[in-house]
Swiss-Prot record:
One of its GO terms (biological process) is arginine biosynthetic process via ornithine. InterPro entries: Arg_succ_lyase_C, Argininosuccinate_lyase, Fumarase/histidase_N, Fumarate_lyase_CS, Fumarate_lyase_fam, Fumarate_lyase_N, L-Aspartase-like. Keywords: Amino-acid biosynthesis, Arginine biosynthesis, Cytoplasm, Lyase. Belongs to the lyase 1 family. Argininosuccinate lyase subfamily. It comes from the Bacteria. It is found in: Cytoplasm. The keyword Cytoplasm applies. Pathway: Amino-acid biosynthesis; L-arginine biosynthesis; L-arginine from L-ornithine and carbamoyl phosphate: step 3/3. GO terms for molecular function: argininosuccinate lyase activity. This is Argininosuccinate lyase. It holds the Pfam family Lyase_1. The gene is argH. It catalyses: 2-(N(omega)-L-arginino)succinate = fumarate + L-arginine.
Length: 473
């Protein structure tokens, strides 16, 4: 006959669950990650029980001493879940009772449920994980800013639709990848403000009748406040879904950067060489240097998106309050964090060690008639309507393409035939350096504007590192 050993329930039942049910319910293989937080929260809960008069000073002291010893044993690996333990909560209660006895250890469960307990622990774990992820993202931003600083004047082809568009600074392009990553960290900072609300004290769903103080335990655990609604506190996982979205968005932003690096490293582009330490070879082709980090970033982004999608599907259509479906909320987030913790240091190292071939980029910058817009805007400055100037620039491209020359190589006669006010003076703006320098409005690709952008990125990076200081990591 099966028993309820290792469970936090059982009095209602004549026997234990069927083996298949026990196997299905078991979660220690993943929720053991919450064990340090469970012990920390149990110490705080014991203090609240004492404040409510439900423990004596001696009982509180024994509980805290037992929990601290249990925490050391968990950290060292001396104490691990048993096969009979259903979840992290039951395993730790068993461990506590082994250390302080059932009379003392059995008192800790008063006034709390696994429902409010796990909702709190999951928030604690995620807040710390988000801090670590933020640091990793900021390391990638730092690498991008450093590369931008090392190449302040390098000009490259700017592209739209992956076709030649306009010349831009390499630094401008690199900082364009830094901006969304900074926004991702901003999102995590904003997310933390909403997540710093403690469900502890909500009980199963209705709150506690034992005179406990949810605000006291919230502050003890580093939250800003206790939840306003006990039903919402135990049943909502929007904080997890929101974190999952930001993690997926980080992956998407890294994937876009990775796609550029992959393309730039091809023979056809030839913009960069990958450092040997951050690339791999082929088992059959001796010449290969493969961008595995960038490719894995693309691949893992699909995994991050899948984790978010799976969690959202789990959350839909659940009635209030807690449902066992929510056992499935943690593994997707645990996996997303694990994948980003693998990926982010590798991406930072890859970016920091890229060797750019700036002469090659400068050579290709005017290819594909990327100065056609400069020609049109020169005509606008002569008082010609842009519609007319656009048509004239397009015709100039057609004529130059037919001759196999650049726009600057058209003769004065060819310019005049295209439009009477299009003269040879236009050649003054038909250089990549002049084109880049002319884009000097805020956010533009002119060197002084890009230098300002880099300073803003570095300033924001430093602010975000300071805001991230609450996370022990």
């Amino acid at each position: 006959m099966s028993t309820n050993e290792g469970s936090l329930w059982g009095g209602r039942f004549a026997g234990g669950p069927a083996p298949a049910l026990a196997a299905l319910s078991k979660s220690t293989h993943f929720d053991w990650a919450l064990a340090p937080y469970d012990i920390q929260a149990s110490v705080a809960h014991a203090r609240v029980l004492r404040k409510a008069g439900l423990l004596t000073d001696e009982q509180l002291g024994a509980l805290v001493e037992g929990l601290e010893q249990l925490g050391r044993d968990v950290a060292s690996g001396v104490f691990v879940p048993a096969d009979t333990d259903e979840d992290v909560h039951g395993a730790l209660e068993r461990g506590l009772i082994e250390r302080v006895g059932p009379d003392i250890g059995g008192r800790l469960r008063a006034g709390r449920s696994r429902n409010d307990q796990v909702a709190t622990l999951f928030r604690m774990w995620l807040r710390d994980a988000a801090g670590r992820i933020s640091e990793g993202v900021l390391d990638v931003v730092q690498a991008l800013a450093d590369q931008a600083g090392a190449h302040p004047d390098a000009i490259m082809p700017g592209k739209t639709h992956l076709q030649a568009a306009q010349p831009v600074l390499l630094a401008h392009h690199l900082l364009a990848h830094a901006q969304p990553l900074l926004r991702d960290v901003d999102r995590l900072v904003d997310w933390d403000r909403r997540t710093a609300v403690s469900p502890y004290g909500a009980g199963a769903l209705a709150g506690s009748s034992l005179g406990l103080d949810p605000d006291a335990i919230a502050l003890d655990l580093g939250f800003t406040a206790a939840a306003d609604n006990s039903i919402d506190a135990t049943s909502s996982r929007d904080f997890a879904a929101e974190a999952g979205f930001v993690f997926a968005m980080i992956g998407i932003d890294l994937s876009r950067l990775s796609e550029d690096i992959i393309l730039w490293g091809t023979t056809e582009f030839g913009y960069v060489t990958l450092d040997d330490s951050w690339s791999t070879g082929s088992s059959i082709m001796p010449q290969k240097k493969n961008p595995d980090i960038a490719e894995l970033a693309r691949g893992k982004t699909g995994r991050l998106i899948g984790n978010l999608t799976g969690l959202l599907a789990t959350l839909k259509a659940q009635p209030l309050a807690y449902n066992r479906d929510l056992q499935e909320d943690k593994e997707p987030l645990f996996d997303s964090v694990s994948q980003l913790e693998l990926l982010l240091p590798a991406m930072a190292g890859l970016v920091a060690t890229l060797r750019f071939h700036t002469e090659r980029m400068a050579q290709l910058a005017p290819a594909g008639f990327t100065l056609a817009t400069d020609l049109a805007e020169w005509m606008v400055r002569q008082g010609i309507p842009f519609r007319v100037a656009h048509e004239a620039a397009g015709e100039a491209v057609r004529v130059a393409e037919a001759r196999g020359v650049g726009l600057e190589d058209l003769t004065d006669e060819e310019f005049a035939a295209i439009h009477p006010e299009l003269t040879g003076d236009v050649r003054a703006v038909l250089t990549t350096a002049g084109s880049v320098a002319s884009r000097d409005a805020r956010g533009g690709t002119a060197p002084e504007r890009v230098a300002e952008q880099r300073e803003l990125v570095l300033a924001r990076l430093n602010v975000l590192r300071g805001q991230n200081g609450r996370h022990p990591g």
